[in-house]
Amino acid sequence: MKKKVVAMFLAAVMALSLVACGSKSDNGGSGDASGTETIKLGGVGPLTGGYANYGLSVQHGAELAVKEINAAGGVNGKQLELSFQDSQGDPESAVAAYGKLMDWGMNVSLGAVLSGETASVVAAAKADDVLVMETTGSADKCIDGNDKAFRICFYDSYQGTAAADYLTDNALATEVGVFYQSDNDYSVGLYNAFVAECQNTGVTIKETQTFTTATSTDFSTQVNALASSGVKVVFIPIYAEDASTFLTQAKGKFADDVYFFGADGLDGILGKVSQDVTIADNVLMMTPFAADSADPKVQAFVKAYQDAYNATPDQFAADAYDAVYAVKAAVEAANGSTSGADLAAVMPTITVEGVTGTMTWSADGNTNKAASAILYKNGVGTLFGQDNANDAAGAESGDAADTAADAEA
């Protein structure tokens, strides 16, 4: 009898261990939520430190989308859960945060925020059956090597090329200056693409100035060189933190009609110059998102965001918001599966009508959508329209006429 009891006990233990092993394999890094009640989304980004404005925007945009989707019934009947971890902008911390999210049971990753940390997270995710729906990591190669990684934002070489084309399409200038960070992948990537396209369009780079992380407090030499060059546009493919320093030191040194032209890294510039928002006057920023757009989807998003966070959403918030809706569309297209392989297979087949535009994806993970530009004046950013372009074209024509008159005299 005693042996029989022991045998029954051992059989029960073996059965329990088999169940436990089965549960672990169902959830341990597979990304598949088919047997769970919720779909877990995880994000990583700087919530503290100098780049916290970007991370908080991404977190808030994603949170808002999750709340809306859950209130509308979820995705295939399942509610979404979101966990967003602080990376402090450090790639190693970002990978550690990604591991923490995998231990939590994350099904889909929203990637990271900055390009450097994104590359590290995407590489770490390669071995897991998890879709990475990258929100804002824009360096060309930061999603390379992982065929389950897709992104919402523009990639850097696209932004640099689009910026150069925008100059000629809107007759902004035929000669430009450039100020970029030579030890930053984001800045260098945009710079290289911009210069290459300027060569194709006939725009002359008249003056180029650089800085590094170690020299990011005093830009007086660069400001003076660019101001004395007489260019009407200075291309600044840098982040808002450094842009605020540059613009503060540049105030009063340039003519009133000079544009400071940048890409998505400038988003949040007004918050960096809140002591005097006119420092950002004539900043022109390439973006797929404009908070003052008449699009009903954008208006609804802006109102909901303002109600929730008492702030106007920037492009980073909009990208994250669209990323969550893209996850929803992919899960629905994959018949409810959250397997990374299944979601990656359907990504090139879906279309998402987002607040950053109509999006489709190529097999390489990059998105296809249109870009526009925002012009800042007196602390307000508005879509840069034809009236602005006509003013710029008129200024160019006037300069040419003045030059011709001087030559005749």
Pin down the residues of each PLM region.
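Extracellular/periplasmic periplasmic-binding protein-like sensory domains
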Residues: 250-321, 381, 387
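Short, low-complexity disordered leader/linker segments with a strong preference
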Residues: 1-40, 71, 388-409
